[in-house]
UniProtKB/Swiss-Prot annotation:
Protein name from the UniProt record: DNA ligase
Residue numbers binding Zn(2+): C430, C433, C449, C455
Disulfide bonds: none
Encoding gene (name): ligA
Primary role: DNA ligase that catalyzes the formation of phosphodiester linkages between 5'-phosphoryl and 3'-hydroxyl groups in double-stranded DNA using NAD as a coenzyme and as the energy source for the reaction. It is essential for DNA replication and repair of damaged DNA.
Pfam families: BRCT, DNA_ligase_aden, DNA_ligase_OB, DNA_ligase_ZBD, HHH_2, Nlig-Ia
UniProt: NAD(+) binding residues: D53, A54, E55, F56, D57, S102, L103, E132, R155, E196, K312, K336
Catalysed reaction, written as an equation: NAD(+) + (deoxyribonucleotide)n-3'-hydroxyl + 5'-phospho-(deoxyribonucleotide)m = (deoxyribonucleotide)n+m + AMP + beta-nicotinamide D-nucleotide
Organism of this sequence: Salinispora arenicola (strain CNS-205)
Amino acid sequence: MPEDAIGQQVPPEQEAAGAEPTSAARERHATLSLELTEHQYRYYVLDAPTISDAEFDERLRELAALEAEFPALRTPDSPTQRVGGAFSTDFTPVAHAERMMSLDNAFTDEELDAWAERVERDAGGPVPYLCELKVDGLAINLTYERGRLVRAATRGDGRTGEDVTANVRSIRDVPAELAPSAEFPEIPGLLEVRGEIYFPIAGFADLNAGLVEQGKAPFANPRNAAAGSLRQKDPRITASRPLRLVVHGIGARQGWQPSTQSESYAALRAWGLPTSDRWRVVPDLAGVAEYIAHYATHRHDVEHEIDGVVVKVDPVSIQGRLGSTSRAPRWAIAFKYPPEEVNTRLLDIDVNVGRTGRVTPFAVLEPVRVAGSTVALATLHNAREVRRKGVLIGDTVVIRKAGDVIPEVLGPVVELRPPDARSFVMPSTCPCCGTPLAPAKEGDVDIRCPNTRSCPAQLRERVFHLAGRGAFDIEVLGYKGAAALLDAQIITDEGDLFALDAAQLTRSPFFVNKDGSLGSNAVKLLDNLTVAKERELWRVLVALSIRHVGPTAAQALARHFRSIEAIDQAGEEELSAVDGVGPTIAASVREWFAVAWHREVVRKWAEAGVRMTEEAVDEGPRPLEGMTVVVTGTLAGFSRDQAAEAIQSRGGKVTGSVSKKTAFVVVGENPGTKADKAASLKVPVLDEEGFRVLLDAGPDAAREVARVED
């Protein structure tokens, strides 16, 4: 949840200024205060919020704006002045030795710049900043006396929290005793360590699935799972959950005064406490902006949820000079990313039939704005996943949309479940053709429509697929064009596509003008089909919709066998032996060619003039033969497909993961965690210039310019 603080700091001299509040302002202030107090209680005590963090922030900012306009409305118990909340709970209250403060928030670059200007003005000049990820978890205060853990407490209202020592002791990351190190041999007699307990994203779905199986309510998101798992009356339940800790600050201490925030992190890690590997000290605000921009595009490479970046003045002496407000330090701020999670209503669950017959449920949502776009649909993967998530039709659900990733339903807000909410029932017959649905083989999670040749949904998806850039690249034949051909019954399956003529196309309104003459769409389609007949063999293989055969496997098959006939005649063992193919793809190829109507499609295309062979050409040297290369980040001179094709044409193999067997990792702008993995495994790393050396001069020359971490 939000930090319960606002990005705007009101100077003391303005506190008493302002007009007399209007009756409307007083009424709105009272309403917002009550709402926010209720939501704080649901968040901090019940671990069951009913609104998203973004909605809370929006209401809190509205309340702060009212108080800025009418200072008389601001009281000490206002939600804008509180840290967390002082609510009665089942845990014993315990006082913090030093107050756990909140953070002011910046939601825009301008707000961050304004904060930095104030800092540098009061500090007397530029200062170095420490940047770290803002973990979306549960704030915790660990108290060590003479190196031994004596107490763990939640933040509470900042002065008094809840004693959760027994539960925290069960978390594997929390050391019961701190160990001196060579660099930091003296452990303070008293040390308060501040951190965040989080639930790893990777384990969240499994936790909810287990709760649903036990008939218990699932959690809406990993943050709620962390809070709910920690605040259990039985520590054994906490111990059974994979909670993790990351520390990010210190409170009261005796006998130790670090000179910088970064030095304190080094000491905490040396004593055995888990600090983040992702914090950085930067010299100026430009460095802060780079850090924020990097994690804005790589926030999903992190093992836990984050909702922003915390920026701190690094020198402790300047922190002391800047001081604090009643709620938050002036030397730190949280830059909040636009929300990727919002709450909305699940109106229905429908199903989609894909090109391979897979039947996939998807959520029909009340449209909501998230991550820069309006979302009305979200994936649910399969019927088992719907059960695992514990969502019912009619629920308020939490959805996440990360950049270009398909929106996903995380889980339900069970507290808002209406009495008429109902379970989803997976259909037993195909919604498009009525054929009984079944798994492709025993034990499959997915169910499929076996009417592969004639099911309208599958055929439409296959035609759309074969027209894509990774296959025949037929520009006019988009989703509407594919549907138009089928709706007018111009083709019975994809085998008829390359025999199309102008007379056939006039049967569809999509391909004709108002006067009945042939439209530009039809002319372009016929021209595109003529060009597509000469596409490379590997593109033909991709266009056939053979399961598991994408561009990489298709290129390997085309390069090795040179013709569709040779691939058809090859046995499974021979196919499997091709580098880049393997047993799964080999079995899929054999299964595909064993179907009579599949072979009929190939025959029709060949008769229509589609090229079914790969001309034997002198490929030239293959200097990367047997080598595996990983590409991460954005390259200025290559698209991802172009980079892969350049590697493969020289005999190399492109993979998506880094291992000790990886020959090179090519790193562009905004690389992901693969660059870090390469460094840890000491795999040679190339920038784009080094990549060109690899392509032009070979691996030996590339090793000369590669970077290998010591």
